[in-house]
Amino acid sequence: MLCRTVMAVSAMLLLATPLQAKDCPVQEFGLEAREDAIRNAPTCRQALEIMQACAYGASGDTGLGAAVRERCEPDFLPKLSKAQKRAYDREQKRCDQKYARQSGTMYRSFTAFCQAQSAAAHAARFGATAKAR
């Protein structure tokens, strides 16, 4: 049984194609420059892509995630009903709670990504470009 599991995992790893990591478009190494690039992104989706490319994988990502939410939320928050806004807030809190009991800066990064991805998904669903489709 263990042998089959090891073989199956090995086969999946061999068949998986590695994803090409995007380079961070921000030439400066500072956190503020990365946050500014996210805030000034033309679209919410591009803001999330910049976060993904420029992420630290540690607690520094909390600032990047906040910048994504600052960029994305104006696209959809005014259009949400009260019930939809409560659902969005619950989703954001769920992201906080998901890794709250875990220690380590990596888990703060996971929380930041969860919240940023939630904001980007809501912007795609309820934002101005969503109605144009």
Spans of features found by a protein language model:
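Bacterial N-terminal signal peptides
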Residues: 6-16
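Mitochondrial intermembrane space
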Residues: 22-133
